[in-house]
Amino acid sequence: HISRVINKNAKISEKASIGPFCYVGPNVELSDGVELISNVHIEGNTKIEKNTKIFPFASIGTQPQDLKFKNEKNSLSIGEKNIIREYVTINPGTEGGGSKTIIGNNCLFMISSHIAHDCKIGDNVIIANNVPLGGHVTIEDNVVIGGNSAVQQFTRIGRLAMIGGMTGVLNCLLYTSPS
């Protein structure tokens, strides 16, 4: 579309789709089947794998919201078959957390969720509307976080956890099996 802005140094698969009013920065990589619907902003050292779909007004790969960040090299990796809905924000890592934010495969990020710097998210995770994750959060596979919940920084949520809506997660929630 004529209204999109794609930096000449971005690596875009011929099988990716970029809709109107999208911005794709110079160090961005978009794989086969990635679809930016419209009004999507992607920058930084961001790599998005196959068949991920991103909806309007998502902001991906912008500078971390951390006062210690001093423009050091960092990255954001988003796996395959993710759905990133409207107004979602995802930040890359910081030096204090290994400089990487990593998102697995087959995840759903609903409207207005926020994935802060240095988060590690497994596969098949669902994060409902208006859920912010603080920095350095780890979410293992097959987790569901209900709407309007909040997850404090440096928290770990174990596989198969189901967190009800409007929950404040202040401590680690690890998977345990019944005895």
Placement of each model-derived feature along the sequence:
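Structural signal for interior beta-strand "rungs" in well-ordered beta-sheet cores
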Residues: 1-174
